[in-house]
């Protein structure tokens, strides 16, 4: 085994170890709460997954529900071990899909790399990211479109068809995800050295299959699970996208600031991708190959369009830039092979990357290793809190959860509403057009009709946009029963050493 293979495996092993032992974020709280609510559902199979609402796409809900279901076969309490097993199972599925991807990449486009090196290199690039991106929809989405690209690079028609199906499936991870199709198209043009006419001719079967698959799948979902289509349409109201809020120039400023911080500091592979892209851009400009330069820029544009349209600029949105990074590095390997005598830029880039990664590894990912004992201690202390102890004795009755998901995570009760965190009420101001929809009216009416024994309330969160009538109902019919502290860091659910908010448990006043 060559030294570079040993080094590559060593870095990959460190990345995987860091991934598995890094703290879960508060999004996992929602994922696990969702899995519990599905298990309480009176429906079976896919109907149960659809019946319980969550903002993410249907395919992504199926992925993390399956992950949680398998994890519960081994351990069923939300401990450090549960988080580790959950991420281990998720990563096993992720790497299985990555193995398929590596196998279908045509040999002529990975010449000089080899499948084993390609697997480890891609594993490093996909996992060397901020822990807020771990197992998010964007992380799965990037792997899906990399697999679609690998299939698309094959000339066989059946590969084109499967590539289109895989690519189309990203719609059910997050509905804007198919925007990455632009990166796939222009990236394939660069890799295959195609003319525009040839590329358009070749993508026709892919495009037709994409339209047919999405149309057919949406029809079937509408036919058998119409509520899912309603949820997809309603989701646009809950998110402050650029389409909802309207264009403003400050969005560009936020995009650039996020690109610098969330890409270079937290999603480390993007730094390597940008360095390689700048080198290729300068090289092609010197050779008057401006077509290549334009295609390279377009390859990076579509993930940025996704980010700016989302109008949130979360760190996991910038994870999408790993996709053009992979394409750029593949091009860089072809243009700057180490086998060419005197060609050393790859050494420079790899050295820069390794130095930067060493810094990132010591300052970002493994901080959990340094405070593991504090982490365990904090979790055990948190489990003893009065509110959680109460939750274990609440019984199996339905509860109204008026919080951001913490209540459904802590208490072992079925949600009174199918929305175990009620975005249809919390995200909607009184003047919002959504208040005229059937969804809003039904959720509001059912909430006002609640007569259960207990309810949870995260007041600062729930009353942010109004809901005065619900506030009056609570003040009149319920009394404060217990308070559960909310952690300071929104990206770190379990590391609770400071409190800045409260989840309130209310009990019905008996008249």
Regions inferred by a protein language model and the residue ranges of each:
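Hydrophobic/aromatic-rich transmembrane helices and adjacent perimembrane loops
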Residues: 144, 179, 310-341
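Short hydrophobic/aromatic helix or loop-helix immediately within or flanking a transmembrane segment
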Residues: 33-37, 51-84, 170
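Membrane-interface transmembrane helices that cradle and orient dolichyl/undecaprenyl
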Residues: 107-112, 138-140, 145-162, 265, ...
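Hydrophobic, aromatic-rich transmembrane alpha-helices
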Residues: 97-105, 262-290, 296-304
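Short acidic/glycine- and proline-prone juxtamembrane loop motifs at membrane-interface regions
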Residues: 130-141, 314
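Membrane-proximal lumenal/periplasmic loop motifs of glycosylation machinery
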Residues: 18-26, 42-65
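Extracytoplasmic
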Residues: 56, 176-177, 222, 226-227, ...
